[in-house]
């Protein structure tokens, strides 16, 4: 038996951050390119760009900035903070659910 969950953050009923956006930002951090990140994730550039821009607009924060090399992208310090806090949130929820799972296993 397992308890399943998904976490995302909404503002005014619209997604601003979740596992998908987290994955996109981490791929950008590794690749320094939205195009390369999208390819790595099996997404179109347009889909990755759309999610990134939607999050930036809804948060009213820049998540990426242009690098020194042409067309390179880097995460902003705010993006890194958001990723860090999201990972902590995931870990906290995981710990709570792990305890709940143990309790439910006793009942079933």
Language model feature labels by segment:
Residues 66-89:
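Basic, amphipathic "hinge/linker" alpha-helix immediately C-terminal to the N-terminal HTH DNA-binding motif
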Residues 29-38:
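Short helix-boundary/capping micro-motifs
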Residues 51:
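Residues within the DNA-recognition helix of helix-turn-helix
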Residues 46:
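Key DNA-contact positions within bacterial/archaeal DNA-binding proteins
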Residues 82-104:
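Alpha-helical linker/hinge and terminal dimerization helices associated
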Residues 24-25:
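Short alpha-helical "packing" element that flanks the helix-turn-helix/winged-helix DNA-binding module
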Residues 57-62:
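Residue cluster at the C-terminal edge of the helix-turn-helix DNA-binding motif
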Residues 1-13:
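Short, Lys/Arg-enriched N-terminal segment that forms or immediately precedes the first helix
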């Amino acid at each position: 038996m397992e308890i399943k969950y998904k976490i995302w953050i909404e503002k005014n009923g619209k997604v601003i951050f979740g596992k998908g956006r987290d994955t996109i930002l981490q791929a950008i951090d590794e690749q320094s390119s939205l195009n390369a990140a999208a390819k790595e994730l099996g997404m179109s550039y347009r889909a990755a760009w759309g999610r990134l821009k939607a999050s930036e607009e809804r948060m009213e924060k820049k998540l990426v900035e242009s690098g020194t090399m042409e067309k390179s992208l880097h995460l902003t310090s705010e993006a890194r903070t958001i990723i860090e806090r999201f990972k902590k949130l995931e870990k906290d929820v995981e710990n709570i659910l792990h305890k709940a799972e143990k309790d439910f296993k006793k009942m079933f």
